[in-house]
Amino acid sequence: MSAPLTWHDVIGNEKEQPYFLDTLAYVAKERQAGKTIYPPQQDVFNAFRYTELADIKVVILGQDPYHGPNQAHGLSFSVQPGIPAPPSLVNMYKELASDIPDFQHPNHGCLISWAKQGVLLLNTVLTVERGNAHSHANLGWETFTDKVIAAINEHRSGVVFLLWGSHAQKKGYFIDANKHHVLKAPHPSPLSAHRGFFGCQHFSKANTLLEKQGIAPINWTPELPQ
């Protein structure tokens, strides 16, 4: 048996590409200029730290990190422990409460326990300037995260992709639906959740799809890290 492929194996080369180096250099320069950039530098790649390629069961695509103080920590939709759940995550909890019978509504918004179970919480853009949504769009992060999704598509099978809103759906358009499971719904933000995110039952559907493959389901009740 060969060892399972790692992130390093499939996207390690990206770190040497000019677009990637340019992106990192731009972000570093902004930080050096005194701008507040989220998430903190050590958290930018947390999605890959918590969820190795071989362990992915579910992918939840976000857009760019939260741009308020102490929120973003490198996982889409998740906030640092002790920070109230933002509106989109509140709506995710509402859907979970109606979808998963034993869901326990948490008093926090930290989704590290999902990531550790194999839910890749991936934003398509990995940094943002404080108070300025989408300020780091089109720097090069999208190229990198396209490569990440392509690597999952190619090297894994049976992964459940949850694509909420047009941004995530465009990003995931090339995922092979014969090889993976692609579930689509409107975004959970208060602007669009009532258009079909509520009632989509993606969390229970994801678990059913995993169990059909003999894979342990996700415990969707977020637990704080010990």
From Swiss-Prot:
Annotated CDD domains: UDG-F1-like
Listed EC numbers: 3.2.2.27
Active site: D64
GO terms for MF: uracil DNA N-glycosylase activity
PROSITE patterns: U_DNA_GLYCOSYLASE (PS00130)
Similarity remark: Belongs to the uracil-DNA glycosylase (UDG) superfamily. UNG family.
NCBIfam families: PRK05254.1-1, PRK05254.1-2, PRK05254.1-4, PRK05254.1-5, ung
Name of protein: Uracil-DNA glycosylase
Gene from which the chain derives: ung
